[in-house]
């Protein structure tokens, strides 16, 4: 095998790879073995005609397609390894020379990992991030717990008041016509919750069970549906039932019922401690992100478009998986959000570029600092991931993960070490 390398443009190289005629003939024979059964030649049972007859009957090129694939699969990986080329995508293969008794020559044009010029990455100055737990946040959490433990019962007599729950049938019209998604029966709505648009809920105050009313509202300009944005609408509403929500008193008895604590003060203290922990983790994550951004701002990289496009595709696949768990698909998501594949991808572009840049910087720092993942760390990481699957045989699952996802585990471990290095060497400023 002979290889010539030509730099076509920045981050794009073309390899001209020559496979000697003997090797190519072996690939042709291999192709014949693979395809022999599909050839039907008069005078021979199907699949039994010899190679020389097949060539005469069908032409020598009939076996070239698979022979080319065999040669490329064998020689291309060796060529990029020998020339220290790190591709970021599949190559564009073009045949230069092919034929019986000839050397097989082809070119492989491929985009490569870009050069990363690191700037200052140790000692970057980053503003301190900190959060305090507000008393209001604790009170809001208590109110939320109070709401979850409220007693709800039917209101036998009287009108709808703020805070009541109305059971309604409704049908909406825009421009005199019913619209999709504008109708429901036995719908529960808490008056004053702001669930519905405009003052829809306020217009129900004062109504009694079995009464009906036309409610007039306007959809917000940015409602998210072109057929409804900014348009006035009329809803025919019928009150089916009225419910009253009775909140439990916030006292020691409440604390005993909803927690392991004996007093309300102990419950408040626990809520505050949990919030402190959450805010501390949030501050840590934001500080780490700020450190990485500062390091990124000091680096120079010309990212190939194909890397960004690949990351966008990964993000779309992740979105598709998340939607699947919710019983949705991409088509439904696009319709619901009044979007499209093109709009979503464009929205993801900035984040994708940021992710690719960060990954490249982390890899380059790991290379400069000689940061690697040890076998012990790989085992621990695999075990950590395996436990999340909830399988009985965790050790066996970890072993499977370690083998199948080794490269991903290594990247995760190395990136974590690089992040620790950057944070430890950063300068926190007020």
From Swiss-Prot:
GO molecular function: peptidyl-prolyl cis-trans isomerase activity; protein folding chaperone; ribosome binding
Its EC number(s): 5.2.1.8
Disulfide linkage: none
InterPro entries linked to this entry: PPIase_dom_sf, PPIase_FKBP_dom, Trig_fac, Trigger_fac_C, Trigger_fac_C_sf, Trigger_fac_ribosome-bd_bac, Trigger_fac_ribosome-bd_sf, Trigger_fact/SurA_dom_sf
Subcellular location(s) of the protein: Cytoplasm
A single cellular component GO annotation: cytoplasm
Catalytic activity entry: [protein]-peptidylproline (omega=180) = [protein]-peptidylproline (omega=0)
Main localization (coarse): cytoplasm
Keyword Thylakoid set for record: no
Key word Cell division present: yes
Enzyme class name: isomerase
Domain PPIase FKBP-type as annotated: residue spans: 163-248
Keywords on record: Cell cycle, Cell division, Chaperone, Cytoplasm, Isomerase, Rotamase
Gene Ontology biological process: 'de novo' cotranslational protein folding; cell division; chaperone-mediated protein folding; protein transport; protein unfolding
Free-text function comment from the UniProt entry: Involved in protein export. Acts as a chaperone by maintaining the newly synthesized protein in an open conformation. Functions as a peptidyl-prolyl cis-trans isomerase.
UniProt note: domains: Consists of 3 domains; the N-terminus binds the ribosome, the middle domain has PPIase activity, while the C-terminus has intrinsic chaperone activity on its own.
Family classification: Belongs to the FKBP-type PPIase family. Tig subfamily.
Protein name: Trigger factor
Organism: Clostridium botulinum (strain Loch Maree / Type A3)
Gene: tig
């Amino acid at each position: 095998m002979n290889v010539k390398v030509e730099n076509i443009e920045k981050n794009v190289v073309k390899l001209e790879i020559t496979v000697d005629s003997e090797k190519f003939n072996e690939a042709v024979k291999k192709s014949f073995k693979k395809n022999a059964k599909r050839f039907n030649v008069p005078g021979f049972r199907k699949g039994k005609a010899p190679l020389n007859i097949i060539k005469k009957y069908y032409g020598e090129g009939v076996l070239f397609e698979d022979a080319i694939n065999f040669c490329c699969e064998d020689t291309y990986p060796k060529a990029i390894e020998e020339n220290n080329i790190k591709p970021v995508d599949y190559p564009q293969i073009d045949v230069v020379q092919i034929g019986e008794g000839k050397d097989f020559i082809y070119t492989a044009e491929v985009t490569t990992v870009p050069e990363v010029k690191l700037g200052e990455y140790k000692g970057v100055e980053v503003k301190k991030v900190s959060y305090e737990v507000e008393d209001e946040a604790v009170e809001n959490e208590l109110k939320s717990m109070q709401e979850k433990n409220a007693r709800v019962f039917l209101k036998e007599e009287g009108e709808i008041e703020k805070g009541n729950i109305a059971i309604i049938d409704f049908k909406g019209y825009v421009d005199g016509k019913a619209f999709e998604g504008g109708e429901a029966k036995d719908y529960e709505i808490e008056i004053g919750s702001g669930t519905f648009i405009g003052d829809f809920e306020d217009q129900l105050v004062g109504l009694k069970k079995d009464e009906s009313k036309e409610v007039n509202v306007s959809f917000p300009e940015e409602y998210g549906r072109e057929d409804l944005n900014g348009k006035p609408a009329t809803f025919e509403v019928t009150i089916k039932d009225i419910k009253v929500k009775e909140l439990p008193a916030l006292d020691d008895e409440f604390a005993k019922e909803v927690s392991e604590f004996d007093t309300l003060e102990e419950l408040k203290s626990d809520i505050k401690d949990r919030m402190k922990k959450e805010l501390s983790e949030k501050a840590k994550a934001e500080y780490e992100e700020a450190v990485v951004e500062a390091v990124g701002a000091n680096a120079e990289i010309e990212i190939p478009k194909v890397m960004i496009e690949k990351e966008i595709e990964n993000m779309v696949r992740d979105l598709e998986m998340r939607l699947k768990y919710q019983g949705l698909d991409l088509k439904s998501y696009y319709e619901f959000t009044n979007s499209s594949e093109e709009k979503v991808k464009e929205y993801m572009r900035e984040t994708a570029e940021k992710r690719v840049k960060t990954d490249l910087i982390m890899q380059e720092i790991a290379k400069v600092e000689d940061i690697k993942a040890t076998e012990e760390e790989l085992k621990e990481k695999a075990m950590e991931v395996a436990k999340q699957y909830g399988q009985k045989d965790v050790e066996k699952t970890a072993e499977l993960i370690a083998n199948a996802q080794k490269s991903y585990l290594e990247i995760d471990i190395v990136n974590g070490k690089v992040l620790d290095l950057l944070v430890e060497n950063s300068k926190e400023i007020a």
